[in-house]
Amino acid sequence: MTKIALIQQPASGSRGENINKGVAAIREAAGNSANLLCFSELAFDRFFPAQPAGPDRDTLAETIPGPTTDVFTALARELEVVIVLNFLEMDGGKTFDSSPVIDADGAILGSTRMVHVPDYPCFHEKGYYTPGDRGAAVYDTAIGRIGVAICYDRHYPEYMRALAVAGAELVLTPQAGAADEWPDGLFEAEMRVAAFQNGFFTALCNRVGKEPRMEFAGESFVCNPAGVVIARAGRGSDEILYSDLDFSEVALSHARKLFLADRRPALYRDWIES
């Protein structure tokens, strides 16, 4: 059994303050026997894509490894936990919406970059993010095989299926979901279906709190491979959501016993490219 913790915390205007709060949350969660800890999208900053990118955009970004990963790799090593972050990455003059995955020995196993980049009111992301160029990576961690679907990528069944085909047992979604952004129930329904169709656990960690241009709902949650919500955080609450996962459920799921085995990928190219 693996215990995960989704850190649903509000962000102030101080990155240092937010990182310190995150460190305290990880220590608390590790003290409560959590083995894997995940933050929301851009957890250590106010949600700057709420307004169009300006000339200061690059000052918001940092490298991987860099100052933020240095803090959390040391913490992962000390506490022997897996940590998934999310922030604006700078690499080769380009910026990405990135989630470094840090193993329990402090090693950075890799960094998932958001592939699909939206742009609509209060989510002016095309001005900040270059579309990810690394595909749907799955990481062998101390607790199991995990993938990351950053925010908007969760809407793409091709992306979620790619994680399943690569053997993901758990898919984490660092999310920035505004209050009342979606019709009631749809927020969870999408991830429940993804879990059921692909035979993995899904865990969505959402931002929370009022910011100058918008309010984030929280309501982080975890689904099992049967598509059932097994843990749910409160609306608007600053909290750590815990959930115990039994990865033996993955192999027993309908998706792993039936759906994936019966795929016919030779037919799909013509369908999706037409």
Regions found by a protein language model. Name each.
Residues 98, 111-113, 173, 232, ...:
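Residue-level detector of high-confidence beta-strand sites
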Residues 1-5:
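Extreme N-terminal starter segment of soluble prokaryotic enzymes
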